[in-house]
Amino acid sequence: MSDNDELQQIAHLRREYTKGGLRRRDLPADPLTLFERWLSQACDAKLADPTAMVVATVDEHGQPYQRIVLLKHYDEKGMVFYTNLGSRKAHQIENNPRVSLLFPWHTLERQVMVIGKAERLSTLEVMKYFHSRPRDSQIGAWVSKQSSRISARGILESKFLELKQKFQQGEVPLPSFWGGFRVSLEQIEFWQGGEHRLHDRFLYQRENDAWKIDRLAP
């Protein structure tokens, strides 16, 4: 098969969206109510990693970067994730805190996009979550200098065993280079796949203490 033939096959990959639509009359005034409903349905549907979200940032040159992380908490203040503070995404957020999040629930023919500003979590919030993690995950946080270049996986594995021995007694301390961010809720867009590619899109935008809701063309 030639490269052109393979490209033609990819171009014809498609499916119809048949899960149902999203109507304005069914929307709650608060987008978190709809988000919670959709997230609950994603969990009930046994989707793999229903809390997985794409976090998009930009560097100082305007170059976009994306990666998947797990949502760990959400409320009216924003959506929370944790990371190594020496990572590329953390440095980019420090330089430009404007980010977007995307929840891709393909099986349900849905996606949710959040736009807002990321702020560092307090040490108290980070410590509370850190010590709720499995012990090996706590140790793993100490091992990796995230986004740095390494010559072999064995370096990480050896470091993990070394630190597991070091921290075998008592509580694993919180690394100073490990923390989290809360992304404020400025805009939230809900997308539901529709028949004939007539998808339903609704954008919530915060205006003072209320939310403005607009339908967007697909």
UniProtKB/Swiss-Prot annotation:
The gene is pdxH. GO terms for molecular function: FMN binding; pyridoxamine phosphate oxidase activity. It comes from the Bacteria. Its cofactor is FMN. GO terms for biological process: pyridoxine biosynthetic process. It holds the Pfam family PNP_phzG_C. This is Pyridoxine/pyridoxamine 5'-phosphate oxidase. Pathway: Cofactor metabolism; pyridoxal 5'-phosphate salvage; pyridoxal 5'-phosphate from pyridoxamine 5'-phosphate: step 1/1; Cofactor metabolism; pyridoxal 5'-phosphate salvage; pyridoxal 5'-phosphate from pyridoxine 5'-phosphate: step 1/1. It catalyses: pyridoxamine 5'-phosphate + O2 + H2O = pyridoxal 5'-phosphate + H2O2 + NH4(+); pyridoxine 5'-phosphate + O2 = pyridoxal 5'-phosphate + H2O2.
